Amino acid sequence: QARLYKSVYGCETVGAVAIDLEGNIAAGSSTGGFSPMLPGRVGDSPIIGGGTYADNRGCAVSMTGLGEKIIRCSVAKEISTFSELGDSVSIAAGKAIMRLLKRIDGRAGAITLNRDGEYCLIHSTDFMVGGFIKGKKMAVADQFKRVL
């Protein structure tokens, strides 16, 4: 069954955003990579500002999608900057992902979180699986948004 899953879905990105008791935010991303990939290829996950970014003045962001396009537009950093300038994390993520789509036909997904605990799971891909835990409550559907 694991081989079937891998052959259909490949190695997917796992991302996380978190907030501590003092209101500091953090983001992390890990990826199985794009297949087939060139030897030495580095995707967006380890690139700060590309696929992962966190700034207490804006928001924490973890991205998934075609890394080269995400890096080229520094999407995670852009989302945080829009948030810092006053947009909600949902509006900030939507604006940045739409710019990526319109500018270079880049498709991506993001999870975002700011210091106030406002979060968003958003994507322009065919699908994106995500979840959110706040305390002992788990939420997904009310904040999961697809942009076209």
Please identify what each model-predicted range represents.
Residues 1-148:
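N-terminal nucleophile
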